[in-house]
């Protein structure tokens, strides 16, 4: 491990975490991230133009292409931008709401997978590890890290409201489980983690490095184009220690494509949107076109995803509004990671993960605690959703197998919470 990765000082001040205070400052109001959309008037104008083109030149090679593009945009009216959804659309149902959920088994299983993978690699790293969670959302995994005796947690997300919820969750955890004696430094940062113009790590003091980087159920939002996924991977790897791990969970590309192809009439030459949809009463996946231009790489393969409770968008008539996601072509992702000195060490579908990890007593005990009614026939349709997902683990450095615990120096015992310069009412609390 290089010298720069070890340069922590217990006398550091909290404000020293940020490289430049001004760069981390945000306004109190939330400014929506606007998506470029055609107005209804522009769409009508385009329709008339296409109609005219058809009459004047029926052999126009671009006519059909333009027509399908316009039709696709019309059909995508029911698609919600993930940025808008997590900024404005999502409402946490709360603990009681989650308990009453019809997909409580799915939620529990996903939490078991995350708890197991976090537990395994935190133990490999040793006590006092530092964690960077990208797309941390409402902080649902905070306690999973705390139970592994980490010393530093930094959570970053695009949605301010989610981060405020994460800070509230942190306050509750430390009060109820740790009797106000949680000696872990926690920092939250609002930023677009895949913006090519904005590398949020440049805002953080260069002496801060991380032993574990995590991105759970969110990587698919960043596969929109090559620039965005590269910007994201730069953020994931740039401050990851040599020998550290990058862990995550995503929808598996092979599974989603196989299910799409198994749909009846999917090869029908007619463009019928409903034939690009699959799912059950709990979830739905919807593609908006059959063919994608991948001449510049397998990026931007957009689909809509709906999951009851978690992504619960319906219009006034009860029709589903899907949240946009992008297919992560994993083979391409592995090659991209190599550019950032990240090398694959583990990849498993959730069902295979369960089959393998349940053989270990440590994870079996965790399973007995977190998973109930495994043989209940009523959860069969939730297993169908579970099979969509996979976990991945990359290690920084191709031949680096050194996990010497002595290299991890304890961080500050003081625990402050920062959302850039936005301070919640409980931010003044310190812990001795």
Task: Provide a role label for each language-model segment.
Residues 72-125:
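Class I SAM-dependent methyltransferase Rossmann-like catalytic core
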Residues 128-137, 154:
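Conserved class I S-adenosyl-L-methionine
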Residues 140, 146-196:
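Class I SAM-dependent methyltransferase SAM/SAH-binding core
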Residues 199-213:
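A short acidic, Gly/Pro-enriched loop at the edge of an enzyme's catalytic core
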Residues 228-242:
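A short glycine-rich, Lys/Arg-flanked "PGG" loop and its adjoining helix->strand segment in the class I
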Residues 242-251:
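Conserved beta-strand signature within the Rossmann-like core of class I S-adenosyl-L-methionine
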Residues 259-308:
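Conserved Class I S-adenosyl-L-methionine
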Residues 290-432:
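C-terminal lobe and adjacent flexible extensions of AdoMet/dcAdoMet transferase-like proteins
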